């Protein structure tokens, strides 16, 4: 979603290379539209995307902790520039509950206080939702 980014001709960003970035050492009057398998894999698994999902989740939690409905609204506004519809909201609430249950099981052996456990679970579930939002077709392709 970036129109311009500063790039040194001799140093390519590995993330952009996987998205079939142009060769910066040659001029090009026109680029052909391409889709390569690594694009989807980078968006699903890359460290960069996971970091961005975590940053977005922390930002949203700062203002909307304990309010899943408001969190879902904010995720949709930030990722897609629109509110979720009723079905999407329902699916997201179900997803947050499911992820919270998974994270609760994963953290069950840790020595966390109840408050720490609850906030960690909420943060991780919301991070998962942000990651999902980054992988929606609507995030990649404008209608």
What are these language model-derived features?
Residues 83, 87-89:
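Extended, well-ordered alpha-helical scaffold/bundle regions in very large, multi-domain proteins
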Residues 1-75, 79, 83, 125-143:
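An acidic, gly/pro-interrupted, aromatic-rich
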Residues 87, 108-109:
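Surface-exposed patches in mature extracellular/periplasmic domains of secreted proteins
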Residues 70-72, 104-107:
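Short, charged low-complexity intrinsically disordered segments located at boundaries
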Residues 109-127:
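Intrinsically disordered, low-complexity acidic Ser/Thr-rich regulatory segments
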Residues 22, 47, 99-106:
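A short secondary-structure junction motif
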Residues 90-101:
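Amphipathic alpha-helical segments that form the core helices of the histone-fold
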């Amino acid at each position: 979603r970036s129109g311009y980014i500063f790039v040194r001709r001799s140093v390519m960003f590995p993330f952009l290379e996987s998205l079939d970035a142009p060769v910066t050492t040659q001029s090009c009057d026109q680029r052909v539209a391409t889709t390569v398998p690594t694009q989807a894999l980078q968006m699903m698994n890359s460290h960069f995307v996971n970091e961005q999902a975590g940053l977005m989740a922390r930002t949203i939690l700062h203002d909307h902790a304990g309010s899943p409905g408001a969190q879902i609204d904010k995720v949709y506004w930030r990722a897609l520039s629109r509110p979720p519809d009723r079905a999407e909201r329902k699916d997201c609430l179900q997803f947050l509950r499911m992820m919270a249950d998974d994270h609760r099981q994963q953290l069950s052996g840790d020595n966390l206080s109840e408050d720490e456990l609850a906030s960690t679970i909420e943060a991780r579930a919301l991070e998962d939702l942000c990651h999902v939002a980054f992988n929606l077709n609507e995030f990649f392709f404008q209608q």
